[in-house]
């Protein structure tokens, strides 16, 4: 397989180390044709992208494209913030972005305490204890992933099953139905080879 793009990169606008231009230069050196700058979503308490910085980020992206010849997409790795499938990239934000990633993350402002408890806290407790979450927790996480895909124009779900466990087959079927890709993230081991076969 020849890779032509990298659609999950960060910059100092969230917690990345390299600038937009440095990411584009690295992509060009690796023979890639395009990349996406997908800094963490607005509700991330520590690393969240700020709405007031969007114009500056777009300006850097335009400049990086000119200097490198690489196609640079402006995106965001938004945060899933409720079981109902809400995201911190709201409908009014969609027009600012070229690509829409979404995942479940820690240290995020959820829509409500019950959403944080049901989507993150119970999953994370099981993860830290090395146990499988209850069927109800898996059901809630699965519902959250399915709802985010159904209710939003999500292009890519990021690192599903990393600390937050779902029914992979059900989520994969929903993504297939709605044209949403599922990221396989080699930095965060989140699905096994057997689970990949289940999702296929």
Q: Which functions belong to the PLM regions below?
A:
Residues 1-8, 116-121:
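N-terminal small/glycine-rich loop or linker at the start of catalytic domains
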Residues 4-14, 37-42, 157-161:
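Histidine-centered catalytic micro-motifs
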Residues 13-51:
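Metal-associated gating/positioning segment near the N- to mid-region
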Residues 15-19, 166-172, 191-200:
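Histidine/acidic-residue-rich catalytic or RNA/ligand-binding cores of hydrolases
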Residues 27, 65, 175, 199-200:
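A generic structural signal for well-ordered alpha-helical segments
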Residues 36-37, 101, 158, 183:
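Conserved beta-strand positions in the central sheet of alpha/beta enzyme cores
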Residues 47-178:
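Extended substrate/RNA-proximal surfaces in nucleic-acid metabolism proteins
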Residues 179-191:
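His/Asp/Glu-enriched short active-site or ligand-binding loop at hydrolase and phosphoryl-transfer sites
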